[in-house]
């Protein structure tokens, strides 16, 4: 049986988390704590390593701790029975760097699908209440993780739509 799981994550200056390391069991893990201590930010940082971007924040400067000029997330995963180290770093005002086993990706889309993940939050009521656009985006994100052809065609399609809308 092929299994994917996270062994460990080290988070530095990610939102309200200044410097923490978390070690996980390969079965079930529970995050427990008072409101505002960073439980959701831990989940978002894991999502960030799996997808290459935050689930909750579109802009990189929103995820860097306000007291610092950079953020770093480092995760040790087991993917398809192989050890994988994923690192994401951002300097304030700079570009995001995403690395797999110490090698930087040229395109973020090359990373998508290595560590499939789905995150659903209380903010996702729009999947049910709003129109089909939000549902389509959600389904596209899931399919794209498992089908590179679909991902590449979706990227091309979105570029065509953007170009058309500029006319």
Annotate each predicted stretch with a short phrase.
Residues 1-48:
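Pre-Walker A-like glycine/lysine-rich segment at the N-terminus of P-loop NTPase domains
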Residues 126-167:
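An accessory alpha-helical subdomain
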Residues 48-51, 166:
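Regular, well-ordered alpha-helical segments
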Residues 51-126, 132-134, 146, 150:
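Nucleotide-state sensing region of NTPase/ATPase domains
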């Amino acid at each position: 049986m092929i299994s994917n799981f996270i062994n460990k994550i080290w988070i530095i200056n990610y939102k309200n988390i200044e410097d923490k390391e978390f070690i996980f069991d390969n079965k079930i893990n529970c995050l427990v704590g008072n409101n505002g201590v960073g439980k959701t930010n831990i989940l978002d940082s894991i999502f960030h390593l799996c997808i290459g971007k935050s689930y909750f924040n579109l802009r990189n400067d929103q995820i860097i701790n306000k007291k610092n000029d950079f953020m770093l997330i480092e995760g040790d995963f087991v993917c398809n029975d192989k050890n994988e180290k994923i690192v994401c770093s951002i300097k304030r005002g700079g570009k995001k760097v995403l690395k797999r086993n110490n090698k930087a990706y040229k395109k973020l889309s090359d990373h998508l699908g290595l560590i499939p993940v789905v995150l659903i939050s209380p903010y996702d009521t729009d999947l049910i209440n709003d129109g089909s656009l939000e549902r389509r985006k959600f389904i596209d994100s899931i399919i794209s993780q498992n089908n590179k052809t679909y991902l590449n065609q979706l990227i091309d399609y979105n570029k065509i739509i953007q170009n058309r809308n500029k006319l």
